[in-house]
Every structure is written in structure tokens, then in C-alpha cells.
Amino acid sequence: MTALKNDRFLRALLKQPVDVTPVWMMRQAGRYLPEYRATRAKAGDFMSLCMNPELACEVTLQPLDRYPQLDAAILFSDILTIPDAMGQGLYFETGEGPRFRKVVSSLADIEALPVPDPEQDLGYVMDAVRTIRRELNGRVPLIGFSGSPWTLATYMVEGGSSKDFRKSKAMLYDNPKAMHALLDKLAQSVTSYLNGQIHAGAQAVQIFDSWGGSLSAAAYQEFSLAYMRKIVDGLIREHDGRRVPVILFTKGGGLWLESMAEVGAEALGLDWTCDIGSARARVGERVALQGNMDPSVLYANPAAIRAEVARILAAYGKGTGHVFNLGHGITPEVDPAHAGAFFEAVHELSAQYHG
């Protein structure tokens, strides 16, 4: 494979020295960019865009072409590709978000679910990874990703997005055997899917536990973290002569960082409700940290964005082990120039903390 021209993202995850703090942004290929909206219009709809490796590659590279400061690319896809490959029938309702034609409501439903084969059932994702790696040509590392078992389970049981997760939580408390069976099958599926992405060329992977923070502390340990540990235990950790770092991101998980740091991932993602300095004091010996600016800061003027970047860099302090990111994905209404001001500020203001 081509040598990496910029590996500071991977170096920071492995707590090796860097010249500046690396930066990338969740949803960096997304609706805030006019070039993304044009490609999506060309594709016809969101899933057609995900399922076309050439167009998925095009949108993955768009933010890198616009923002030379970006230190990583992230595969353009969706966390719900796995349930879709299990036969749940993913579709998108305008204004409603993702929906499934089939819902999971019983142990019999769960037992009937297949574990998708990455190349056979999700080949379009693997093709996208290969295409992006080829086109990147070593410019920056490529991040692969998946949803966590608990997060995927909520969509499968609810039939789509949910504000209160009532069906998922009812199953969790009423029928824990069924929920564990579903989570176990999803953990197998995610492990196989991420390993497929690593074989295809992903140089780091992130597990998005978007809804882990909706659980009680005890339920989080049993129904979310335990299954992410299974995944981390089953992942390929060396590929192409390099360590493949794993980032674990539970939105709303700031209370549980110590437990998360024991799972074996190289890094933890933080949302914006955490103080990154205290997070470093708690778990910084064991893991790198990624985050954690409030995405809404990008609605403010560039001077205010710069001030918030400076505050977070100072809170983390000197040395490596920090990948700058938002605490969740960028929102569609942000001015692209404000994202550029964010990336510039991270590189410019962080040099003093390194070397």
C-alpha cells in the first residue's frame, strides 16, 4: 500500500509525538457542503449515494479538497447498512429520517436474522473503502466505522429513530434474553463488518454508540459496553504493517469513561458535555481522547470559534493523545467557511502544545 504522507491522526491515537493536534470532523462529508448536495442530487437519494462506490468516494474526498488542514478521511456510509443487510428493509422518509419495513419484536425474529457477510452482503461498502484508499493515495488515513450493537438494536426494535426508546427498553427489561440474543448477533455482525473494512483498507475504525447514553449505568455496562468489548476483542489490530486503532464513542457516556477505557480501544470519543481536561486526568494514561467541541459553536463567528478551540486545547494541555473533533456531527446549516476557520484554528493554536 502507498505510504502515508500525513499520519499525525494515527500517531495521536497511539500517543506518539505529533507537530500539531490532528483534526477531523464527524459528518465532514455532509449537507453543509454545496458540493455534497450536488453529488447527492446526482445520485438521486441518500441510499443510492451510499451504494455507489464512486460517488461515495467523491463525497468522502470533497471536504479534503476544500480543507487542506483535515488529517483524516472517514468513509461515507450509514450505520444502518448492517440491519439493512440483515433484511430489515431500510428506507428514508422525508423529514422522518431512517425507517425499517420490518421490525424485530420477538426471539423468533432475532433467531431468523442472518449475520451479513461483508463482501457478499455489504460489498458496496467494501468497494467504497477500496476506491477511497486508491484515490487518497496516502494523503491522509481512512477511518472505517459502524454503529454499536445497542444503537443498531434500537433502530431495529423501534423501526426507526426514537426519542424515548420505549420498545427497546421494554424488551431490555421484559425480555433480556431476547435483547441479549439480538445484541450478540449484532456484535458478531459488527466485528465481521469492521474487519472487512480493515481488510479493504480502513486504517482506523470508530464504533458509534449514539444511544448508549440513554441507558442507566447498570444497563449501559450489560447491554452496550459488554458488546463493544466483544467487538474490540475480535477486531484485526495489525494490518499492512501498522496498528489499526479503535475509537469508542458513546454519546452521553462521560460518566463511564473509566469502564470504557478498560475495553481495549486506543481512544475514546467525548461529547461536548465532558470537560476534556478532567477526562484526561481520569483516563488519559490509558487512552487517547477525541473531541469535543459543541457542534453549535460553528454557528458563531470565526473569532468565537477560535476562542473555543483555544479553550479546549488549553484544557487538554501539553503533549499528544488528543484528536480534535466535534462532540457530535456537524449540522447541515453551518457555513462551510466556519468549518474552515475551525480547522485552521486547531492547527495554528495547537503547535505550542507539542514539541
Curated annotation (Swiss-Prot):
Signal peptide region: none
Residues involved in substrate binding: 27-31, 46, 78, 155, 210, 328
EC nos: 4.1.1.37
Localization terms from the record: Cytoplasm
Pathway: Porphyrin-containing compound metabolism; protoporphyrin-IX biosynthesis; coproporphyrinogen-III from 5-aminolevulinate: step 4/4
UniProt cross-references to SUPFAM superfamilies, sorted A to Z: UROD/MetE-like
GO MF annotations, alphabetized: uroporphyrinogen decarboxylase activity
Cited Pfam families: URO-D (PF01208)
Annotated site (Transition state stabilizer): 78
Catalytic function, reaction form: uroporphyrinogen III + 4 H(+) = coproporphyrinogen III + 4 CO2
Keywords: Cytoplasm, Decarboxylase, Lyase, Porphyrin biosynthesis
GO cellular component assignments: cytosol
Source superkingdom: Bacteria
Biological processes annotated in GO: heme biosynthetic process; protoporphyrinogen IX biosynthetic process from glutamate
Subunit structure: Homodimer.
Protein's job: Catalyzes the decarboxylation of four acetate groups of uroporphyrinogen-III to yield coproporphyrinogen-III.
Family statement: Belongs to the uroporphyrinogen decarboxylase family.
Descriptive protein name: Uroporphyrinogen decarboxylase
Native species: Pseudomonas aeruginosa (strain ATCC 15692 / DSM 22644 / CIP 104116 / JCM 14847 / LMG 12228 / 1C / PRS 101 / PAO1)
